[in-house]
Structures are given as structure tokens and as C-alpha cells.
Amino acid sequence: TLFRSPCEPRPWTEAERPATFVELHVEQGRHLVDVGQAVGVGSGIWPHGRFRFDFAGEANHAGTTRMEDRRDPMLTYAVTSLAANKQARLSGQRATFGRVEVTPNGTNAVPSHVTAWLDARCETEGTLDQLLSVITRQAQERAERDGTRLTVTTESVSGPVRFDAGLAARVAADHEGGAWPLIPTQAGHDAGILAEAGIPTAMLFVRNPTGVSHSPEEHAEPADCLVGVAALADTLERLAS
């Protein structure tokens, strides 16, 4: 435990504010695979928004209700999900409907209500606003066609996080193999919290061969991990000198 270690656990106070924070993390994508580098340096974190889409229709019998008589919110949601995917692909952003709740959620019932949550991540806040606007407009157009109703609620929006540019440039340049690439991340990290607190912060990413994250397939090769650890140790040694 911490009590048995040389470090005594105690509250972190403003008097103990760190001068710099550097985080080492596996890349949660495949940019480093594409550029053939074992390590990359984070430039910042994309803006991130979560939005609730409520689609209201009319519950009815799945067998006796003719297709043309239905007001099916599941159909409106399905078209909205496809629209979100298409718009994100066209603009190089991220849009995911990863959670859906259906009422009454019966095999033999046309739903009366569908709630779906959109996770959207974009390079800038303006791009995030634009992506949401396009998806919402297309969803509304489909709702009018389906005889359903749409309500969109913003649940949370996180602005961009910029890591210390001077520190990132120094970490990227000062190593034996040349310059590590600077890459943005679309995921939240501890480093982002500390950067927003005004602490000079940097991130090092280790190549992920699969590019997969939040899955058992996420991993990094031991050789790349060693390169990442060496880069972190070298960075900390230079910062402490």
C-alpha cells in the first residue's frame, strides 16, 4: 500500500502544484501505424459533445398495422444514424450513436418512442456545431416524412484542450531518432484535466498495431512500449535537469 511505500500519502495542495505533467498512453487509433512511427506526441484534445435525440411516434401492432399507416420513430432514428455516419465521414470528424433505448421495446410492437445518444468529436468547436446542425436538420426532415417528432438536447460539451506547444515541440524534437510526429487525440485523458488547470502538459503515445481501443484487441508491441518508456524517461530527465 501507499502507507508502506517511501511516499507518504497526503492531500495534493496548491503549494505542491506540479511544474509539469507528462502522460504516456497507448494510441487509441492507427495514425502512428500509418506514418510508421513507434511514438507520437500529443498536440491537443478535440472538442467533444454528447447529445440526446428523442424520437416520438405512435405505438401500434407490428402485424396488423399497414406500413403506410405507421409513425415509426425507429425508422427516423435509423436514417438519422446513417446521416450522422455519412456527415462525419465526409468532414473527417467523429459521430457515434452508441446507446439507444426503445419504448415499449417489444418484438411485436411498433415503437412509440426512441431515445438515442450521439457522441460527436470534431477538430474545432465550430466544426462540432456545424456537424450537429447538419445531422439535426436531416433528422428533422426525416421526422416530418415519417410523421414523428424530434427533440434534441445538449447533455454536455467539452471545448478543445491544447497541450503546451513549447513543451510538445521539445518532447517531439529532442531524442536520438529524430522528431516524433505531433498528433491530436480525440479521447479524454488525465493530461487534459491538468492542462485545463494551467499546468504545462504533454502526452506521449505508443503505436497500437490494431488501432482498436476499448476492446481486448487494444495492445502495443513490447518493443514499442520500450521506446515509449525510454522517451518518457528521457523527457523527465531533461525536465528535471
Regions found by a protein language model. Name each.
Residues 112, 180-231:
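Zn-dependent metallopeptidase/amidohydrolase metal-coordination segment
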Residues 96-106, 117-124, 149-168, 190-192:
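A short beta-alpha structural unit
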Residues 3-126:
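Midchain, well-structured core segments that form catalytic/ion-binding scaffolds
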Residues 158-162, 178-184:
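Short, glycine/charged-rich beta-strand-loop motifs at protein surfaces that mediate ligand recognition
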Residues 87-95, 143-149, 175-180:
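Short secondary-structure junctions
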Residues 43-45, 61, 65-90, 132-137, ...:
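His/Asp/Glu-rich mid-to-C-terminal helical/loop segments that flank catalytic regions of hydrolases
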Residues 127-131:
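Solvent-exposed, non-transmembrane alpha-helical starts
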